[in-house]
């Protein structure tokens, strides 16, 4: 059985809800899921026997890209994670009225690619409140690529 880790940072609860929907999609595909708030994860956990690691982070800020506050320490130390060759995927919530819609998703994905991680599927950028069907469908597509 494949094993996955979903790490999320959430301020208003939207990204946490999205992470739960992704977990639901993975469980429907009989993939073992660990769902963790970013505050409960260290970089050492990320390469720890998982077939895929998913990162969920909301975007804040109007003038520049701002990651969700709790996610920043993990993002800043991500280079220390053993993710070379590891399958990863990224999702997040944002607001398309802002200049950098879901910029955190792009920033995380770019950093992971530079580290040699293998990004599978397109990232998911959620505009506003998460919609279950859209997210479960995306998660199922990612799960099929493991």
UniProtKB/Swiss-Prot annotation:
Segments forming domain Flavodoxin-like: 4-143
Required cofactor names: FMN
MF-aspect GO terms: electron transfer activity; FMN binding
Keywords noted in UniProt: Electron transport, Flavoprotein, FMN, Transport
Secretion signal span: none
Pfam families xrefs: Flavodoxin_1
Superkingdom of the source species: Bacteria
Disulfide bond annotation, renumbered to this chain: none
InterPro entries: Flav_short, Flavdoxin-like, Flavodoxin, Flavodoxin/NO_synth, Flavodoxin_CS, Flavoprotein-like_sf
Record function comment: Low-potential electron donor to a number of redox enzymes.
Family label: Belongs to the flavodoxin family.
Protein name, as recorded: Flavodoxin
Organism: Maridesulfovibrio salexigens (strain ATCC 14822 / DSM 2638 / NCIMB 8403 / VKM B-1763) (Desulfovibrio salexigens)
Lineage: Bacteria, Pseudomonadati, Thermodesulfobacteriota, Desulfovibrionia, Desulfovibrionales
């Amino acid at each position: 059985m494949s094993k996955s880790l979903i790490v999320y940072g959430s301020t208003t609860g939207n990204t946490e809800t999205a992470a739960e929907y992704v977990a639901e999609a993975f469980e429907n595909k009989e993939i073992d899921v660990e769902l963790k708030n970013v505050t409960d994860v260290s970089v050492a956990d990320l390469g720890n026997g998982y077939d895929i690691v998913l990162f969920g982070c909301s975007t804040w800020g109007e003038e520049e890209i701002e990651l969700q506050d709790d996610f920043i320490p993990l993002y800043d130390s991500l280079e220390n994670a053993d993710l070379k060759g590891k399958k990863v995927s990224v999702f997040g919530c944002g607001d398309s009225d802002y200049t950098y819609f879901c910029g955190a998703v792009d920033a995380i994905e770019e950093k992971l690619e530079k580290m040699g991680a293998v990004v599978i599927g397109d990232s998911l950028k959620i505009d506003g409140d998460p919609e279950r069907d859209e997210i479960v469908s995306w998660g199922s597509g990612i799960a099929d690529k493991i």
